[in-house]
């Protein structure tokens, strides 16, 4: 569980499902008592704030997002690992100065921030200063601090399907928008990556994704369509290629590939059958 009321229910021996708020845990939480639920990263900032003072801490970061942020930098990048940067550092600085650029000299394509429910941002977003408000405004989020870099060999339709598959598995099942709505989104993405999609499906993805964001009960459900909606907004041409021409430019959707065998080079390994 990641949502605060679901965490509390798990601690009480109940099923890990969220509840409507208010009341918030600070008013009625564990065993009905006032309960403070925070991320470990938030709590880790407390000692240095107490030691050096809030005024010193406020000198780091942006106007509305103070301090630093830890990211798990991964993907098609030369330097992977945990990094800590001041709020306001740009995505470009993280990817190219700290991350060392794209692995193998490939072309940058996208960066996904915020974990499985985060959005996929493009080259035009690289100079965006990292803070809570800026990432939300661009269709992504800070989330758990995940940051995955993608290159020209990644298919953004397949990427959206990958993250949504995770969300469907992790849904607690309590609210209908998340339990059923995300399954419908995943079914459509499977159709598209298998060459059975239509342009009508693209409109359905957009409409249904927004409904889920507006009506799901907890943060997981409300943010789960982000990978779909952000890739639709930023890589719409890839979706169109999949549904109109039944082609995947990144050659990641196996159902859209056509294989040929060169008899002169074939060694009979049968790998092409797998």
Feature annotation, model-predicted:
Residues 10-22, 124-141:
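Active-site loop ensemble at the mouth of alpha/beta enzyme cores that anchors a bound cofactor
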Residues 103-138, 233:
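Terminal amphipathic helices with adjacent charged low-complexity linkers/tails
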Residues 1-87, 99:
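Hydrophobic alpha-helical positions that pack around
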Residues 21-48, 112-114, 199-211, 242-254:
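Short, conserved aromatic-histidine micro-motifs
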Residues 67-79, 85-87, 91, 249-274:
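C-terminal accessory/binding modules appended to enzymatic or scaffolding proteins
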Residues 87-104:
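Short amphipathic, charge-patterned alpha-helical segments
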Residues 129-263:
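Ferredoxin-type iron-sulfur electron-transfer modules in oxidoreductases and energy-metabolism complexes
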Residues 91-94, 107-108, 171, 184-185, ...:
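Extended, hydrophobic alpha-helical segments in both membrane/secreted and soluble proteins
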